[in-house]
Structure formats: C-alpha cells, structure tokens
Design a protein with these regions (language model features):
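N-terminal leader segment of winged-helix/HTH proteins
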Residues: 1-37, 84
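C-terminal regulatory/oligomerization modules of transcriptional regulators
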Residues: 1-7, 129-146
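Residue-level marker of regulatory loop/turn positions in helix-turn-helix DNA-binding domains and
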Residues: 11, 39, 50, 101, ...
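Charged, amphipathic alpha-helical coiled-coil/dimerization segments
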Residues: 27, 77-136
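N-terminal helix-turn-helix DNA-binding core of bacterial DNA-binding proteins
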Residues: 28-68
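Short helix-capping/turn signature of helix-turn-helix
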Residues: 50-53, 114, 142
Length: 146
C-alpha cells in the first residue's frame, strides 16, 4: 500500500499550524477597521453569518457560531446599538427574531470584507483552478468532520 506522507503526524501538525496562520492573517487584515467601532472578532463572525444568511434567527446563529446565548447577546447588543443589524419578528412565529444587516451594517461589512478580500483573492488568483477546487473540498471535509 502506498505510504501517504501527508497523513503523518508532522504533516498534520504543520497543516493545523498553517490553518491557524491563514486564519490569523486573514482576520488581522480587518482588525484596524473593527477597532474603530470597538468591535472584535466575535462581532465580525456574527456580522459575517448575518450577511451571508439574511433573516437568520438567534438559535441558528448560536448553533453556527457554537457559542452560548449569553455571550452572543453582548455582541448583538453592541451591533444593534451601533445600527449594524436589526431584528425583525418572524411572520410565522413571533417568538423568533430574524436578524438582518442594517444599511450601516452593510456598508461596514463591505469595508471589512474588502480588507480581507485582497489576501484571499491574491491567493486564489495565484493558484490553479484545480488547486482551488481541491482546497475548497478539503476545507468542507474539515468542517463536516469527514
């Protein structure tokens, strides 16, 4: 059987380290923009999920972020107070509140996104389409635990 060198412990540890550095660098690009609003990484994660999933409800957001309701409430209060997001009662179940980016939030998110986009865009542009597709496939398998 062929020896799979990329499955050895040292290779896996290196891959984990590279994932960390990629995450760190991608999100450090937006740190200055976030700090002007006194926001941190938790605010950005919430904004990102709300932007990508307009109308997401609180339970779904908690599940996707893997945080407690208590920790998310502080972040949401900050975002609502800053007019970044708005809560709208669900038409079918008024106990649920759906979250949307407000106009200010859309503008702010675009600024943050554009700071991160440069790094990702350059990496994708300087890779073959086959590499990008395979990398995306590997990331999805990491996320899904397969």
């Amino acid at each position: 059987m062929k020896d799979l060198l990329y499955l050895k412990d040292d290779q896996i540890k290196e891959f984990i380290q590279l994932l960390y550095y990629a995450y760190r660098e991608t999100f450090s690009d937006s740190k200055e923009v976030l700090s002007k609003k006194f926001f941190g990484p938790a605010h950005l994660r919430a904004l990102n999920l709300i932007e990508r999933n307009p109308g997401i409800n609180l339970g779904e957001l908690i599940y996707d972020l893997k945080v407690t309701k208590q920790s998310l409430n502080r972040v949401l209060r900050d975002l609502i107070k800053s007019k970044m997001i708005k809560q709208i009662k669900d038409e079918n179940d008024t106990r649920k509140k759906n979250l949307f980016l407000d106009r200010e939030g859309k503008t702010f998110f675009e600024i943050v996104y554009n700071t991160q986009k440069k790094r990702i865009f350059n990496a994708l542009k300087n890779s073959s389409s086959d590499s990008v597709i395979k990398f995306k496939d590997v990331l999805k398998k990491i996320i899904n635990g397969k």
